[in-house]
């Protein structure tokens, strides 16, 4: 059904998986997409919608984002990989090895930061539920979001300021951004990858 427009809508792979990667990338960079250029491919002739998508984004703070999502990458098991490159170095994280973050400073050696290890940010410490060396698991990632949202709701009901570390949960605007990105990516792919505005009207 994911590739049937009558059931899935205008996009398959990008709408199913790509928007989650886009949201994570926006959160990590602290920037929102401004424009995008999309290349959609259907590797099976029977599929109307895309099963492989490569989308480039121009972000609000000047960053460049390259997003690839595919359901035909044989041998990759939910291979979510995030890489960030900046003037001070590069970061790399892979979902298949979720407890390690690789940091390579410019002209330096690669360091491995372990989840739950010393010297991490308060946000990272707060999100760790089990001791170092034990897998957190995907459900706990969602539990962190629900716990943060519950803290904000309770704080509002009780008339107090919520814990500032709990204010990083996805909002309705993030959902709107995902829907706008799907429409823009479909339009861009249909125009041979033409750069297309990826902002919701409220951010234009």
Residue ranges and their predicted role:
Residues 31-32, 47-49, 63, 76-80:
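Glycine/proline-rich active-site loop of Rossmann-fold NAD(P)-dependent oxidoreductases
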Residues 187-204:
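C-terminal capping/lid region of NAD(P)-dependent oxidoreductase domains
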């Amino acid at each position: 059904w994911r590739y049937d427009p009558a059931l899935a809508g205008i996009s398959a792979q990008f709408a199913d998986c790509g928007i989650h990667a886009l949201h994570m990338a926006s959160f990590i960079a602290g920037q929102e997409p401004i424009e995008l250029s999309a290349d959609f491919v259907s590797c099976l002739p029977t599929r109307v919608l895309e099963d492989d998508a490569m989308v480039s984004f121009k972000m609000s703070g000047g960053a460049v984002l390259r997003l690839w999502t595919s359901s035909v990458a044989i041998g990759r098991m939910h291979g979510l990989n995030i890489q960030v490159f900046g003037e001070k170095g590069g970061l790399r994280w892979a979902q298949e090895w979720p407890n390690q973050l690789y940091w390579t400073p410019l002209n330096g050696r690669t360091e491995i930061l372990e989840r739950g290890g010393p010297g991490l940010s308060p946000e990272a410490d707060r999100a760790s539920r089990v001791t170092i060396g034990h897998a957190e698991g995907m459900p706990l990632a969602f539990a962190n979001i629900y716990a943060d949202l519950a803290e904000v709701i309770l704080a509002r009901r009780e008339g107090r300021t919520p814990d500032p570390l709990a204010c990083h949960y996805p909002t309705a605007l993030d959902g709107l951004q995902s829907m706008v990105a799907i429409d823009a990516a479909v339009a861009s792919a249909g125009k041979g990858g033409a750069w297309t505005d990826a902002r919701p009207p409220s951010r234009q």
